[in-house]
């Protein structure tokens, strides 16, 4: 074997087509390698076009192709999205491209996903956190996705109707069977996730390795209890609504949409609030400081700076928006820029943090009760990728 052949065999891989292909470990408890931005498939389909805009199958396939061509491998969907079209079209795309092994697919169970065909009230056990709902949902997701395994399965929404042991035992059984590799949970109070992971650890079951929740510069409630909980249990955080339901838009972009006859399509309302407009303007200021126009790239960069193991979900329907958002991976926001963005909102950690303070591992500073006793120095936890001690992008 020649030196060139040895280098080709054991040398490093070539640089990726974009930073989307510079993969990251999902979490301390899940070693799978994923793209730093996850493609959200909520809009892949045309069944919900009245609320989310239309996307025919050709456009969906083109978007998936563009994401993969840029190095992306991490796709987020759910059993109910677009009345089951989302999973179905993704399955067709992977089958046609013969790329299932290259993709990391996350899907979800919990909400009623069959009423669109069976009728309201006639699909009662197709929803819920219980074992029967889980069994049928995974069976159907595997069929629609045309695969024999799901990389990450989320509980979509906690509904308070199923015990922690029933849920975790049933999920662990799927992992043992090889139908699911990693477990995630969405839209659930921190105390429930803590109880579930504690049960799993004590019983030798599979714990949740990733949490999915709503987070952006204006909606920071996740930082209060969920972010510390995720750190404690070694969980990643995948983020939806990272772009303010599509309402973080510059004046230029809004004018362009108006000229093209497009409004704001958003689940949480179709008009910018005064605060969303103010945040859009602030994002634009930071974007200009970095020599770009994309306010959405700055919104994503903000989340990527906040903590390690954070993976924003990027949705939308246009390939140009995908490329704009990939710019976020090359941005490094300063501490001052992050504080400037956060000053637009009115988030407050509240009790008990306003009394006991926050973890010195995050701030490097003693809490009031500790400072009262003696001067102290603290080891700080790891920063987000790209953020060193001298360029602190983490919240302080």
Swiss-Prot record:
It holds the Pfam family Aldo_ket_red. Gene3D superfamilies: NADP-dependent oxidoreductase domain (3.20.20.100). Keywords: NADP, Oxidoreductase. GO terms for biological process: terpenoid biosynthetic process. NADP(+) binds at residues 76, 186-187, 212, 241-251, 317-325. GO terms for molecular function: oxidoreductase activity. Signal peptide: none annotated. The keyword Transit peptide does not apply. Pathway: Secondary metabolite biosynthesis; terpenoid biosynthesis. SUPFAM superfamilies: NAD(P)-linked oxidoreductase (SSF51430). In A.calidoustus, the austinoid gene cluster lies on a contiguous DNA region, while clusters from E.nidulans and P.brasilianum are split in their respective genomes. Genetic rearrangements provoked variability among the clusters and E.nidulans produces the least number of austionoid derivatives with the end products austinol and dehydroaustinol, while P.brasilianum can produce until acetoxydehydroaustin, and A.calidoustus produces the highest number of identified derivatives. Belongs to the aldo/keto reductase family. Aldo/keto reductase 2 subfamily. This is Aldo-keto reductase ausK.
């Amino acid at each position: 074997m020649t030196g060139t052949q040895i280098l080709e065999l054991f040398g490093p891989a070539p640089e990726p087509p974009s930073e989307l292909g510079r993969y990251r470990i999902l979490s301390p408890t899940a070693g799978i390698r994923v793209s730093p931005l996850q493609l959200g498939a909520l809009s892949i389909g045309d069944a919900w076009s009245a609320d989310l805009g239309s996307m025919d199958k050709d456009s969906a396939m083109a978007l998936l192709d563009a994401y993969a061509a840029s190095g992306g491998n991490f796709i987020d969907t759910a059993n109910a999205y677009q009345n089951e079209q989302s999973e179905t079209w993704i399955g067709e795309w992977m089958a046609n491209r013969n790329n299932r092994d290259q993709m990391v697919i996350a899907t979800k169970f919990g909400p009623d996903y069959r009423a669109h065909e069976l009728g309201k009230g006639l699909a009662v056990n197709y929803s819920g956190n219980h074992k029967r709902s889980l069994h049928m949902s995974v069976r159907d997701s595997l069929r629609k996705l045309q695969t024999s395994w799901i990389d990450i399965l989320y509980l979509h929404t906690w509904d308070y109707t199923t015990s922690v042991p029933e849920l975790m035992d049933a999920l662990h059984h799927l992992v043992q069977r090889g139908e699911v590799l990693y477990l995630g949970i969405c839209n659930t109070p921190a105390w429930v996730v803590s109880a579930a992971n504690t049960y799993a650890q004590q019983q030798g079951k599979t714990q949740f390795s990733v949490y999915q929740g709503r987070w952006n510069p204006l909606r920071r409630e996740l930082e209060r209890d969920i972010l510390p909980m995720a750190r404690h249990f070694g969980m990643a955080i995948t983020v939806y609504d990272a772009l303010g339901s599509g309402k973080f838009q510059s004046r230029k972009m809004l004018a362009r949409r108006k000229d093209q006859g497009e409004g704001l399509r958003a689940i949480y309302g179709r008009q910018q609030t005064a605060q969303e407009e103010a945040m859009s303007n602030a994002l634009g200021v930071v974007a200009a400081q970095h020599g770009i126009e994309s306010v959405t790239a700055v919104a994503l960069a903000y989340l990527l700076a906040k903590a390690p193991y954070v993976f924003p979900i990027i949705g939308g329907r246009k390939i140009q928006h995908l490329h704009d958002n990939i710019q976020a991976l090359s941005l490094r926001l300063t501490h001052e820029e992050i504080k400037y963005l956060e000053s637009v909102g009115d988030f407050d950690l509240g009790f008990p943090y306003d009394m006991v303070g926050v973890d010195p591992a995050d701030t490097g500073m003693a809490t009031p009760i500790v400072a009262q006793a003696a001067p102290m120095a603290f080891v700080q936890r790891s920063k987000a990728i790209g953020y060193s001690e001298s360029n602190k992008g983490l919240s302080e």
